[in-house]
Amino acid sequence: MIGTIRIFLVVAAMVALSLSLIPFQYLFLKLKNGWKRRLPNFFHRIVARLFGFRIRTVGKLHEGCPLLLVSNHTSWSDIVVLSAVGQVSFIAKSEVRDWPVFGMFAVLQRTVFVERARRGKTVHQTSEIANRLIAGDAMVLFAEGTTSDGNRVLPFKTALFGAAHAAIREAGVAEVAVQPVAIAYTRVHGMAMGRYFRPLVSWPGDVELMPHLKGILREGAIDVEVRFGEPVFVTAETDRKALARTMENRVRALLQSALLGREIPEA
């Protein structure tokens, strides 16, 4: 009963919040105002509180040059968590654009939609991401290309790492920062999740979204740790596949450090 009441209250608050802020975001996008980056961050900080996410950050977003963030991917909730931590936009599969409600939010946050299966579009897609990097947008790449169980990092796809090189090539910038990020769901109601309970938040592709969303809303009080690693500064000479391997190893080390509660050196 308590869980049902909590879901109702959170949904009601979300509807009120969304109806209040969505018109402003449309306006900021039309005017190309700087608040087009700030408002999603503000919105998701409130959403994270409503959902019961208690976020702890280790390290910080790199500043000073074009930034591509490379993260592990456990659940749809990663979007809320990272958006609450910083002013970021995402790189997502094209299907997300057509999802009810969530697709609209993705568009409002200026997500770049990609078709991973169509290799012929890779050059165009990396160029689009590069243009956003050049414009000063911190872009998040979930390089696994799918969601994991939250206990491990899956092998990284390498194609979209080419966006860093495209930014250098097209804008003549000297370097692009590529920064590893790990999102770890560690506790629920103060109790360590462990491997057995982490599927509470992990969202594999064969699970329907709405039942999973209700499960998280019913629980609340979920501790999340976001770890930012040291960036790699990419130049025109940097090998794309070697960069992807480095990021995969670093994200894996950051995730294990958060889950185990002890530092594991980045590769």
From Swiss-Prot:
Is Transit peptide there in the keyword field? Answer: no
Which cysteines pair up through disulfides? They are none
Its annotated compartments are: Membrane
Q: What class of enzyme is it?
A: transferase
What is the superkingdom listed in this entry's lineage?
Bacteria
Instruction: Give TM regions.
Output: 7-27
Chief location category: membrane
Pathway info: Lipid metabolism
For molecular function, the Gene Ontology terms on record are: acyltransferase activity
Cleavable signal peptide: none
Q: Does the keyword Protein biosynthesis apply?
A: no
Q: What does this protein do?
A: Catalyzes the second step in the formation of ornithine lipids, which are phosphorus-free membrane lipids. Uses acyl-acyl carrier protein (acyl-AcpP) as an acyl donor and converts lyso-ornithine lipid (LOL) into ornithine lipid (OL).
Q: Which family does it belong to?
A: Belongs to the 1-acyl-sn-glycerol-3-phosphate acyltransferase family. OlsA subfamily.
Official protein name in the record: Lyso-ornithine lipid O-acyltransferase
Lineage, broadest ranks: Bacteria, Pseudomonadati, Pseudomonadota, Alphaproteobacteria, Hyphomicrobiales
Question: Gene for this protein?
Answer: olsA
